[in-house]
Structure formats: structure tokens, C-alpha cells
Amino acid sequence: MKRPLLFFLMLAISIYSRAGDRLSALPYPILGGELSNSATTSVEDIDEVMPRMKALGLNTVLVPAYWELMEPVEGQFDFTLIDRTIDVARQEQLHVIFLWFGVWKNSMSCYAPGWFKQDTKRFPRAATAEGKPMEIASCFSDNVLQADLKAFSALMKHIKERDPQREVVIMMQIENEIGMLESARDHSPLAEKAYQKERWAERYGTDDYADEQFMALYYARYVEHLAKAARQIHDMPLYVNAAMNSRGRRPGEYPSAGPLAHLIDFWHEGAPSIDLLAPDIYDTGFKSWAAQYAMPQRPQDGGKVKNRLFIPESRCCENSGVRALYAFGEHQALGFSPFAIDQASSAETSSVTKAYALLRQIFNYQSSIFNSKTWGLLFDQEDKERVIDDNGVVMTCRHFFTLPWDPRATDGSVWPEGGAMLIRLGKYDYLLAGSGVVVDFKTPTEKQQEQQKLLGEDGFAEAGNTPGQSSKAGKRFHGKRLGLLSVDEVKVDSEGKLKYLRRHNGDQSHQGRHARISVGDWKLLHIRLYEYE
């Protein structure tokens, strides 16, 4: 089947340049949390929930803006909830990202006002291939667009009046998890007219993925109208979020045609005013999903970053903290935000609070931290090890439970994820921030001659022929080695300087063999190396 990708590959360099300027103007990396859908539907709820978000260590709260409550009568706007959110956030010294629950929320038009929902002739619905009308307004209807555009523009104007310097509201999400369900594309009369006009089937084929590409382009063009209007009213970063195409589903089984990684060129072509496409990550494979949205510089984009990673929704769980550290370390993420953090248990939010406390210190220590070389580590029971070669320093990074000393490592327990942000400060000089990881450091020649030995719980090699022992055993060692000069637990003080807390040596470094942070501990380690032979 023909693919229309070549048509979309060469996008205007200026689009990425302007987006980069807007994103670089954000006050800091976003240590966020998204509120549950109904958390701010009254001023009493807002007054209660926002201080709790501050106490959890967030610097930014992602808050729904509900069309049905903002325009209950057509043409009559009520900004009470918006105003209260801005006022309380300002009082709590929090930033806000408003989520426009307009025509679409999780594909459906459930947050459209009653007057919109009931007038299906004026505001037509999308239809499946079998002609079944969906509770999804059709993006091919100009009436739908104009109603949505009018309300969103009114919201942007009001935000500009209340917060003209962007002291509180720093970014806007347009719609929420756009996508067609049950069919790969809309088959309503208006959609069919556009489909025939494009001669899409003739040019690109008729399978589900060709249909999805058609739908993605039209969803993006729809969003562009809102983004362009917003940009003219109050210029700030704008993004759209996506429900992932996971679990082997086909378009329509997952929300088809949303801002998915495999459709990014269609979305960039149709909605050039959008700064970010953002993944909502709930399924397994966190690292893989994140990597699809961290799109580095490419020659065809004029050397500009194609898409910065921002995760506006992720399952709030006991692994959230190490996932945040991974996202910032590996991909220099713009931000991270667990979903429904207001409803999460203390066990689930604890990891977020502790990880964010470490990240605040790191960003305070070196505001331009992403000018340094950084890595993200994230391990579980299946994915236990990563080897990094940093210009002659080979770092073997592993899950803490690869050491035999904790009984949970071998008693059949499910391992919690371990993860960290690893930062090169200079030659033989590193910071490690995280939980549940162990890192050793070797020269390349030392690593090549390494003898793999299983350790007993006393830290010494098991007796006899250890499984996996290198065939190089008995050969004379040659070359230089790296040793730990010091491993210090530190914190960053109010002046942005490293402050010594304690030395990790002896048993805490396995007599100089590695740096480690136990599962359940959250630490910032300053590691210095030296070379010897």
C-alpha cells in the first residue's frame, strides 16, 4: 500500500524553532501531577485539593477546564472554577496547566454542554463503518469546530486577563486523548465527502492504517484552528496528548488517529502550531513508550528537536518516582505527571514526593543540568542491567536486588522497579540520584577481562566453578583499572552547592567495589573515581 509519508517529512524549520523558544521559556522542568477528572468541579474541591498537591512536592498541577460547566448556556460563560484555580495556585506558589475538556475527552464528547449534545442536527456525530452514530462529535463539522473554538478562545482571553504574565498558567492542553473508536475513521456523511474529495483510497489504500492516517490529518487540522486562535490571544506552549496504541490492538480498538508516534508527521503537518505531542503511559514498557516521544535532532528538521518528551499522564504507583528520574535523566524530559494523584494512596505518592525532592535539588544545583551528559536508569525483574560506556568509563548499572544481600532478591518477591538519574559532572566525577540501583565503574580493558562470579550473601565469590565464569580466568591481567576515590551522600543547599552528609565506604560500597542505593532509600550520591595500574 502507498504511504503518504514523503509528503509530510520536510516540515518548516521555523515551526520547531518557535516551539523551542516557547518551551525554553517555561520556568523549570515540570514536577507535575494531574488531578482526577472530577477533582475541581466546585470551589470547595479546589480549595481542598491544591494545598495537598503543594505538600506532595509538586511544582505544577494539571487541572481540567470543563466546557460543560464553563458554558452551560450557549454564549454565557462562567469562569468561577478557572478563577478559583488560578487564585489558589498563586497562593500555594504552584503553576497550572489547564486541560481543555472541550469537544473530546478520551475520544468521547462527554464534556460538551447539554445544548451541544442535544442538537445532533447542528452538531453531528461521527459514525462507524456500519453507520452507527457515536457519542463523538465529528471533526468534519464546521458547526462543531466553531462552537469549540468560541469557547476555547473565551477561555484563553480570560486566562490572559487573570494571569497576563503567565505567572500561574504556563501551558495548555487542547482536548484530551483525541481518537476515533470502533472504526479507524469517521464514516459520517461529512467525513465521507472529505474522504472522496481527497481521493484517499485511490492514493493510499483502504486498510485500517490508511484510514487512520486520513483521520489523523483531519483531527490535526481541527486542533490547528484552536491552537492558532490561542496563539494569537495568549502565546504560551500548547500540546495534545495521546492514548497509546497498546496490547496489539488495531485502529479503532485503540483511539485511532490521535497524536501517536507513528502519526507524528501527519500531526505536525496538520497542526504546526502545536508544540508537543505527549504520551499518556499506563501500559507496561514505560521505557519504550517514552523513547517514541523523545525525538532528537534530525537533519531533515534543520537540526531542531522534533518532539520534547512530556508525560502528562502516567499510572500513579509505587514505581512512579523512579520512572520520573528515568524520564528526566534519559530523555531530558520537559516534565512528568502521574494521573489522579489526588486519589492515590500514600504508598503510591511517597515515591513521587521523594523523587521530586531529589530532582529539585539537582535542578537547583545546576539549572542548566541538561547541558551535562545525563542518563536514566530503570530496572525491574526482567530488565536488570545496563552497561554505559562514557568515553573510557564503563559503568555497569543494575537493579539493587542483583546483589544477594536482601532476602527479597531471592525469595520470590516481585521486585519494585529501581531507577536513577546519572549525571556526569566532569572526568571521573558523577552524581547518582535515585533508589534501588547499584553501579560499578571500570576501564574498557578492565571490563573486557572481567570475570563474572556469583557472590554469596557474605559478599565473597561462591566456592568452586561459578556459572558464567569467564574463560579468560588464569590469564595475566593487563591495563589500567578504575577505583572509587570517594562516594559521598550529599544534598544541595539553599545556595545551590553540594553539602556533604556522610561517606559511603566499607560495607556501604562493598569495600570500594560499587556505589549503591538500596530499595526503599532515596539518595543523592557524589561519586569520584581514580585510575590505577
What kind of region is each of these model predictions?
Residues 10-15, 19, 367-369:
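Short, basic, low-complexity termini and linkers enriched in Ser/Thr/Gly/Pro
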Residues 407-414, 431-533:
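C-terminal beta-sandwich/jelly-roll accessory domains of carbohydrate-active enzymes
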Residues 31-42, 64-82, 130-150, 162, ...:
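The substrate-binding groove and active-site-proximal loops of carbohydrate-active enzymes
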Residues 122-264:
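Polysaccharide-binding and catalytic clefts of secreted carbohydrate-active enzymes
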Residues 19-59:
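N-terminal carbohydrate-binding accessory modules
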Residues 322-448, 458-459, 468:
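Aromatic- and carboxylate-lined catalytic core of secreted/periplasmic carbohydrate-active enzymes
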Residues 225-235, 262-373:
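Catalytic-core region of carbohydrate-active enzymes that cleave or remodel glycosidic bonds
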Residues 46-121, 219-235:
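Aromatic-lined substrate-binding rim segments of carbohydrate-active enzymes
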